[in-house]
A protein has these predicted regions:
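Glycine/threonine-rich beta-strand-loop-alpha-helix active-site module
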Residues: 2-3, 7-58, 62
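General beta-strand structural signal in soluble alpha/beta enzymes
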Residues: 3-7, 46, 109-114, 129, ...
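Short glycine-rich or small-residue beta-strand-to-loop segments that form or flank ligand, phosphate
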Residues: 3-6, 44-51, 79-86, 190-194
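Short glycine-rich anion-binding loops that position phosphate/pyrophosphate groups of nucleotides
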Residues: 9-12, 19, 87-88, 132-135
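Buried hydrophobic packing segments
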Residues: 13-17, 63-66, 99, 203, ...
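Glycine-rich phosphate/nucleotide-binding loop
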Residues: 18-45, 123-127, 131-226
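Glycine-rich beta-alpha junction loops
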Residues: 50-52, 84-89, 116-118, 130-134, ...
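Glycine-rich phosphate/diphosphate-binding loop of Rossmann-like nucleotide-binding domains
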Residues: 52-116, 125-126
Length: 227
C-alpha cells in the first residue's frame, strides 16, 4: 500500500503497521500531528507519543521525517525547531542539548530551540520533541483552547451568531481530531490514524492529505534523506 487511513485503536494500528508494512531502515516509527498555527498554516508536531524517552540521535530521524513530510505537502524549505524550555541552544536537558548540536549538522533548515509559548506563532513549520513532551504540548494546546472558548461562551451568552461561529471555528482549529488525526511515520508507507468518533469531514481531510503525501513521494523523500 502507498498509504493507509484508519480510525482503529491506536495500539492495534501501531502494531499492525509495523508488522504488515515494515519499518523504514534506520528510523524509529513516530506519531506526528499536523496542527494549525495562529495564521491557519500547517504546523507539524512530532513525536506525539510513540517514543516517550528519546536518545539524542533519534531526534535526527524525527527531523528528517518532519522535513520530508512538509516538503511533500508543498514546503520547499521547511523551518524546523526543537522543543525546549528556552530558545538558547544551551537550554534543556542533556538529551535536548545534544540533539540541538546534532540537528545543526544536518542538511535541513534548523532554526534552533523553540519554547512552548512560541509554538503557534508561525515562526516554525516543524517542532521536534520526544513523545512525552510532544503529547503534553498537544493536549495543553487543545485543553487551553477549549477552556478559554468555554469561558467566553459563558460570559457572552447573548453573543451574535457571527461571534458564536467564530468561537466554534477557533475550537475546531486547535482540536487535531477535527483536522484529521495522528500520522504514523517511519514505516514503509505513511499511516493516518483518525479518532474513533471522527466525522465524515475529518475522514475526508485525512484521505486528501494522504493522497497528497503519496503523490509527492513522501516515502521516497525520507529514504533518500536517511541514506
Amino acid at each position: 500500500a502507498a498509504g493507509v487511513v484508519t480510525c482503529g485503536a491506536t495500539g492495534a494500528v501501531l502494531v499492525c503497521s509495523i508488522m504488515l508494512l515494515g519499518k523504514l531502515r534506520g528510523l524509529r516509527p513516530i506519531l506526528a500531528v499536523e496542527l494549525k498555527n495562529a495564521h491557519g498554516d500547517p504546523l507539524l508536531l512530532l513525536d506525539c507519543g510513540a517514543n516517550i524517552d528519546s536518545r539524542p540521535e533519534l531526534y535526527a530521524s524525527f527531523a528528517h521525517l518532519g522535513d520530508a513530510y512538509m516538503k511533500s505537502i508543498g514546503y520547499e524549505s521547511p523551518r524546523i525547531s526543537l522543543l525546549s524550555n528556552g530558545a538558547e541552544d544551551t537550554k534543556g536537558c542533556e538529551a535536548v542539548k545534544e540533539a540541538n548540536q546534532l540537528l545543526h549538522t544536518l542538511p535541513i533548515r534548523f532554526l534552533g530551540n523553540i519554547e512552548p509559548t512560541a509554538a503557534l506563532t508561525g515562526t516554525t513549520d516543524v517542532i521536534v520533541c520526544d513523545g512525552f513532551h510532544g503529547n503534553i504540548l498537544l493536549k495543553s494546546i487543545e485543553g487551553v483552547a477549549k477552556a478559554v472558548i468555554a469561558e467566553l461562551e459563558e460570559r457572552l451568552p447573548d453573543a451574535p451568531e457571527a461571534v458564536r461561529e467564530a468561537l466554534s471555528a477557533v475550537r475546531e482549529k486547535y482540536d487535531y481530531n477535527t483536522q484529521g488525526g495522528a500520522i504514523l511515520l517511519g514505516v514503509k508507507a505513511p499511516v493516518m490514524k483518525g479518532h474513533g468518533s471522527a466525522t465524515g469531514d475529518a475522514v475526508t481531510a485525512m484521505l486528501l492529505r494522504m493522497a497528497t503525501l503519496c503523490q509527492n513521494g513522501f516515502t521516497e523523500r525520507v529514504e533518500a534523506a536517511c541514506k
